């Protein structure tokens, strides 16, 4: 039994089905601590192992930095040395920024652009209003 088989063996029935069904997308909806990240990472490793896709053809997105880091650590542990590329793993925001930076020139932006959060936006507006005596 290889490493991926061990990973799959430790899943429950529904989780195994989600991992092994490699045709088309899966939507995993479950509560906190139920194993969503484990299912996603195991499925990703299984897809690469079964040669259904190259690692860099896979996009795996999550909401939290914690889950993204966990996914990256788990996947890289199993694919290092066996894959020539790395999957796109991360939060919606991180992947979007990576994509925008890669294609910034097509949008007539520099790739070192800054994204302002709400607080920074408010500060910028205040500074402009103050500087323009509005």
Where do the protein language model's features map onto the residues?
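P-loop NTPase Walker
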Residues: 1-110, 115
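Conserved ATP-dependent motor core of P-loop NTPases, especially the RecA-like helicase ATPase domain
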Residues: 92, 110-134
């Amino acid at each position: 039994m290889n490493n991926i088989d061990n990973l799959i063996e430790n899943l429950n029935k529904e989780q195994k089905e989600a991992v092994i069904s490699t045709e088309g997308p899966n939507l995993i909806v479950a509560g906190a601590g139920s194993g969503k990240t484990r299912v996603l990472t195991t499925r990703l490793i299984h897809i690469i192992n079964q040669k259904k896709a190259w690692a860099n053809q896979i996009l795996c997105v999550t909401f939290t930095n914690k889950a993204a880091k966990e996914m990256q650590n788990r996947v890289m542990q199993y694919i290092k040395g066996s894959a020539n590329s790395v999957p796109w793993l991360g939060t919606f925001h991180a992947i979007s920024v990576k994509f925008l930076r890669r294609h910034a020139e097509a949008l007539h932006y520099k790739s070192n652009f800054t994204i302002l959060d709400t607080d920074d936006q408010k500060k910028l507006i205040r500074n402009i209003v103050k500087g323009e005596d509005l």
